[in-house]
């Protein structure tokens, strides 16, 4: 007897997630569904011999029913006699006619998922269908004909018109082909059907409901309009503090800031009233509290007039010793070459202001302008700690609402207190917390940010990742003068604003913005193109230069894929590309007997600035890698929300919008092709990046000619204008670094040059006696050559140097690495003066963060294991809700991100895999300890949690260790590790975490005890099992 159980295919990734949604009544594989049909007909599966032939196909198709589906309809039709005559196309036409003639609007909406679009008035007697996509082809597969033969025409028609049908790709994504668009379930219901205390809320009664108190945005708005909108519950990003070059010579807030604007014309109370409205908008608070808040703001407006910014800035953040003399000497050298000024750049970049000094200046400001009773005692100390934390945050970190409010007790704030009964105290206390949150948010997002912008330039540094550095504006002003003098000699020319305005009108772009990233002895100029484009009517549009180039960018992505696939040149674009080529080379090298290898690495100097724009334009127009026309396809992608955890013990279905989030993504398809969405996803080189998602193609594909997409790219490269320090400049050389298309353009340009000069490296020989096997890769500007012939390596260097001289670019010869000595007779040609300048590598070759063993070709990541280097890449952004889940996700990301290739037998060894594990455990361990410290600090005063914190931190280590090992064994092809390695793996993990947590034993003493006890138990169990085995 057949049993209807959910087999392995029924519990596959996103399919399981689909079952958890309220809108989906049932979701099965087609295989399980046919078994259900068989049971309904009281037949044996032996009558359906063809089912086993299509089992794999049937298990990769999912059929789901909406929640309003009537199961009885299925049973009635399933028991009817089976007829499967006629052609599939005729049957599908009948289904379409049935849907068109239906009076139910939802039936006609199903046409969208079938690849059609309804045209004409819905009240008309006839309708027109236009093809959206090729999804209708999906049902013309032989397997579907076999399914139709098994279940009959009538049941197939029912399946086609009433079910949602998905096909699963090899990456676990479900592509929808039938039924109402699954994305319709994400739409927010406009009707407010949630009951409030005292009866249902009245939609026609504005601002009457008690729940609207803290959520209205204007006089006419009310809570009901915003029930599903998370209003103002989070801090804004700190990005405003970065890269502000405006130099305020008055040593106060900028003139337009509300703290100093109109200070002589409008009274402090009136200005305070305006600021209060800006902070609280139209949300209601009790009158006495409102008056107190306005009074506090007015007090701050009065006190800021007397605050001596210059004195406290000099006191807290002094300029370097003898700054005036140093400044004058450096400014006298502005017109020297960049190389001659390198030591002065190094000196200036070292003049960072310590975070403690910045914190002290901000705290001095608030000590002087805040009313003394605003925050007192412990509350004041905790506020100052939050200022310190805010200053120390990395570039992508921010303080969440709960972290901003924690440890500040509103009951200790005298001016917020109110006399009330114990019964009503909760409501007033809740209001006080809300008011304090709004005030603190305003203080940090407006005052703290404005103070930093006025007096400091904030930036990251090269190779320091997201760590932030503060420079006094006086120092940064000198850096800008020196850098712009260098840039004007190299790539920029100053222009008048009138020329820029004409350029904006003619080409419709917005000028970019230039910023500088400090390096050790120089700087890296980065252009950003986030400014909105102003149209001919002088109205600001929603488009930026990058978004305007979106379709062109999609077209160039097909060029990138063709370059890698054909191949053309030697460019690679990501680590997956690198590892594919590397693995192919290692296999060839092993086939020819693992002969001696020769290594060479080179680096293009100023890669983007060295691109010849005229040649690039010619290359783009004449290349055969670009099709003459393109289709732009738009896909709707439904992704799981990563922070949602399903409780298997207390499971209940929720709405789809609670589990999933949607986004739209576009992809370009070459004009000579018109593949289905499924075919696109099965192509390894597709750019949709849709793994384990739900996806639908629900819009008509747009047609474009190559020339129309290419011209905007050529225009912006040849005529690029930027804004820097209040002046406009035109780029005279190279392509913009920071434009969305620049990396592909640069790679294509150098690949075209490589084709004519380095093609000899493709002539390989697999003769074991004289093997000639080569691997050449270039990631942006970094070359790596591994070859079995020393002559190839020498010729490679000489050819590239010749190409660079012919095309006006240079190689940084200081970064030239070889595994063999170069001929002294060619030093002058290579740009070297002596033997000492040769960089001969031994044992390991380092390239783009990968260390390669030069004898075995085994790999391991090149991870900085200094504590400072480890922590500068850490972004905490702690979540106070489900914090243990946040902690677990953090540890998983530290250990399991981008590590797949380092544990495959085909390209590494067990010894190197263990070295990689050691590095991951050290790096991940220190990051995890920092996160655990944040977690512990947040909950240590929570009596219910405090006793469990250390145990939770330890449990997460156990859980993630098991998940990590399972991932290494089950998810990696040709993995180094097997199940037999698990005991040693777990013990090694515990050993590393014990050592790391022991460095902060005064905080994590109990964690160390728990981990040591677990280690001892594992060793005891291991010994016990060995004794039993011997016996």
From Swiss-Prot:
Task of the protein: Telomerase is a ribonucleoprotein enzyme essential for the replication of chromosome termini in most eukaryotes. It elongates telomeres. It is a reverse transcriptase that adds simple sequence repeats to chromosome ends by copying a template sequence within the RNA component of the enzyme.
A Pfam family of this chain: Telomerase_RBD
Family: Belongs to the reverse transcriptase family. Telomerase subfamily.
Keywords: Chromosome, DNA-binding, Magnesium, Metal-binding, Nucleotidyltransferase, Nucleus, RNA-directed DNA polymerase, Telomere, Transferase
EC number(s) recorded for this UniProt protein: 2.7.7.49
Coiled-coil spans in chain: none
Cellular component terms (Gene Ontology): chromosome, telomeric region; telomerase catalytic core complex
Annotated localization: Nucleus; Chromosome, Telomere
Domain of life: Eukaryota
Location of the Reverse transcriptase domain: 498-852
Protein name per the record: Telomerase reverse transcriptase
One Gene Ontology MF term: metal ion binding
Residues that bind Mg(2+): 603, 781-782
GO BP term, pick one: telomere maintenance via telomerase
Catalytic activity: DNA(n) + a 2'-deoxyribonucleoside 5'-triphosphate = DNA(n+1) + diphosphate
SUPFAM superfamilies named among the record's database cross-references: DNA/RNA polymerases (SSF56672)
Subunit (UniProt): Component of the telomerase holoenzyme complex composed minimally of the catalytic subunit p123 and the telomerase RNA template component.
Main location: nucleus
InterPro entries xrefs: DNA/RNA_pol_sf, RT_dom, Telomerase_RBD, Telomerase_RT
């Amino acid at each position: 007897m057949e049993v209807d159980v959910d087999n392995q295919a029924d519990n596959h990734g996103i399919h399981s997630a689909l079952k958890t949604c309220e809108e989906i009544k049932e979701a099965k594989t087609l295989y399980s569904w046919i078994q259900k049909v068989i049971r309904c007909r009281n037949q044996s599966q032996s009558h359906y011999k063809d089912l086993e032939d299509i089992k794999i196909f049937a298990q990769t198709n999912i059929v789901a029913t909406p929640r309003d589906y009537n199961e009885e309809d299925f049973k009635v039709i399933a028991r009817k006699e089976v007829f499967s005559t006629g052609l599939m196309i005729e049957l599908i036409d009948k289904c379409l006619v049935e849907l068109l003639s239906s009076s139910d609007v939802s039936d006609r909406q199903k046409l969208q998922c079938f690849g059609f679009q309804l045209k004409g008035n819905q009240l008309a007697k006839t309708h027109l269908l236009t093809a959206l996509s090729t999804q209708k082809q999906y049902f013309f597969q032989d397997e579907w004909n076999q399914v139709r033969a098994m279940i009959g025409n009538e049941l197939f028609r029912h399946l086609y018109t009433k079910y949602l049908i998905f096909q699963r790709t090899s990456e676990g994504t479900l592509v929808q082909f039938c039924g109402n668009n699954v994305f319709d379930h994400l739409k927010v219901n406009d009707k407010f059907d949630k009951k409030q205390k005292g009866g249902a809320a009245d939609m026609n009664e504005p601002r009457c409901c008690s729940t609207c108190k803290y959520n209205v945005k204007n006089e006419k708005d009310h809570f009901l309009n915003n029930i599903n909108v998370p209003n103002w519950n989070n801090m804004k990003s700190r990005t405003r503090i970065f890269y502000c070059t405006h130099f305020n010579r008055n040593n106060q807030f900028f003139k337009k800031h509300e703290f100093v604007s109109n200070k002589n014309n409008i009274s402090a109370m009136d200005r305070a009233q305006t600021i209060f409205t800006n902070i609280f908008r139209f949300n209601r608070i009790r009158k006495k509290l409102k008056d107190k808040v306005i009074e506090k703001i007015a007090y701050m407006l009065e006190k800021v007039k007397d605050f001596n910014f210059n004195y406290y800035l000099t006191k807290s953040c002094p300029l370097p010793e003898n700054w005036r003399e140093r400044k004058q000497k450096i400014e006298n050298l502005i017109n020297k070459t960049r190389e001659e000024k390198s030591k002065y750049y190094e000196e200036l970049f070292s003049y960072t202001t310590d975070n403690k000094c910045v914190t002290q200046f901000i705290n001095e400001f608030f000590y002087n302008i805040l009313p003394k009773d605003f925050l007192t005692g412990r509350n004041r100390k905790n506020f100052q700690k939050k200022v310190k934390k805010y200053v120390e945050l990395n570039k992508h970190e921010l303080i969440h609402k709960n972290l901003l409010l924690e440890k500040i007790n509103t009951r200790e704030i005298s001016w917020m207190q109110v006399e009330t009964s114990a019964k009503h105290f909760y409501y007033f206390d809740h209001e006080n917390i809300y008011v304090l949150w709004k005030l603190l948010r305003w203080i940090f997002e407006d005052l703290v940010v404005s103070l930093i912008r006025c007096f400091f330039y904030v930036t990251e540094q090269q190779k320091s990742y997201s760590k932030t550095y503060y420079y006094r504006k006086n120092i940064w002003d000198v850096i800008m003068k020196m850098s712009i003098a260098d840039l004007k000699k190299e790539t920029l020319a100053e222009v008048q604003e009138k020329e820029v305005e004409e350029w904006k009108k003619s080409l419709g772009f917005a000028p970019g913005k230039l910023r500088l990233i400090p390096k050790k002895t120089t700087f890296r100029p980065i252009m950003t193109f986030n400014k909105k484009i102003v149209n001919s009517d002088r109205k600001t549009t929603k488009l930026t230069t990058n978004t305007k180039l979106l379709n062109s960018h999609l077209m160039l992505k097909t060029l990138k894929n063709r370059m890698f696939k054909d191949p053309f040149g030697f460019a690679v674009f990501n680590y997956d590309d690198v590892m594919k080529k590397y693995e192919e080379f290692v296999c060839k090298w092993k086939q020819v007997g693992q002969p001696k290898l020769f290594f060479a690495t080179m680096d293009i100097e100023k890669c983007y600035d060295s691109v010849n724009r005229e040649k690039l334009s010619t290359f783009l127009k004449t290349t055969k890698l670009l099709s003459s026309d393109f289709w732009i396809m738009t896909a709707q992608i439904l992704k799981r929300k990563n922070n949602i955890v399903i409780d298997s013990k207390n499971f209940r279905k929720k709405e789809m919008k609670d589990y999933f989030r949607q986004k739209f993504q576009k992809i370009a398809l070459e004009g000579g092709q018109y593949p289905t969405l499924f075919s696109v996803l099965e192509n390894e080189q597709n750019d949709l990046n849709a793994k384990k998602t739900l996806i639908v193609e629900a819009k008509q594909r747009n047609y474009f000619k190559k020339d129309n997409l290419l011209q905007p790219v050529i225009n912006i490269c040849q005529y690029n204008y930027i804004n820097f320090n209040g002046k406009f400049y035109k780029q005279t050389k190279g392509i913009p670094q920071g434009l969305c298309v620049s990396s592909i353009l640069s790679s294509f340009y150098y690949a075209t040059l490589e084709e004519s000069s380095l093609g000899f490296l493709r002539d390989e020989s697999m003769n074991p006696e004289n093997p000639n096997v080569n691997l050449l890769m270039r990631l942006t500007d970094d070359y790596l050559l591994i070859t079995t012939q020393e002559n190839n390596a020498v010729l490679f260097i000489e050819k590239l140097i010749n190409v660079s001289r012919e095309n006006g670019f240079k190689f940084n010869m200081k970064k030239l690495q070889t595994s063999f000595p170069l001929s002294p007779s060619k030093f002058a040609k290579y740009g070297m003066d002596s033997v000492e300048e040769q960089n001969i590598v031994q044992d390991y070759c380092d390239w783009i963060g990968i260390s390669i063993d030069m004898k075995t070709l085994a790999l391991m990541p090149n991870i900085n294991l200094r504590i400072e280097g480890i922590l500068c890449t850490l972004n905490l952004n702690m979540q106070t809700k489900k914090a243990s889940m946040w902690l677990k996700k953090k540890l998983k990301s530290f250990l399991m991100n981008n590590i797949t290739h380092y544990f495959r037998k085909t390209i590494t060894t067990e010894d190197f895999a263990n070295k990689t594990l050691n590095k991951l455990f050290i790096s991940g361990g220190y990051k995890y300890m920092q996160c655990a410290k944040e977690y512990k600090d947040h909950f240590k005063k929570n009596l219910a949690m405090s006793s469990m914190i250390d145990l939770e931190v330890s449990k997460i280590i156990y859980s993630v260790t098991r998940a990590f090992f399972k991932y290494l064994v089950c998810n990696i092809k040709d993995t180094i590790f097997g199940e037999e390695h698990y005991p040693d793996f777990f013990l090694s993990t515990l050993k590393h975490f014990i050592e790391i947590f022991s460095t902060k034993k005064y905080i994590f003493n109990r964690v160390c005890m728990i981990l040591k006890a677990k280690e001892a138990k594992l060793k005891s169990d291991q010994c016990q099992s060995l004794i039993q085995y011997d016996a």
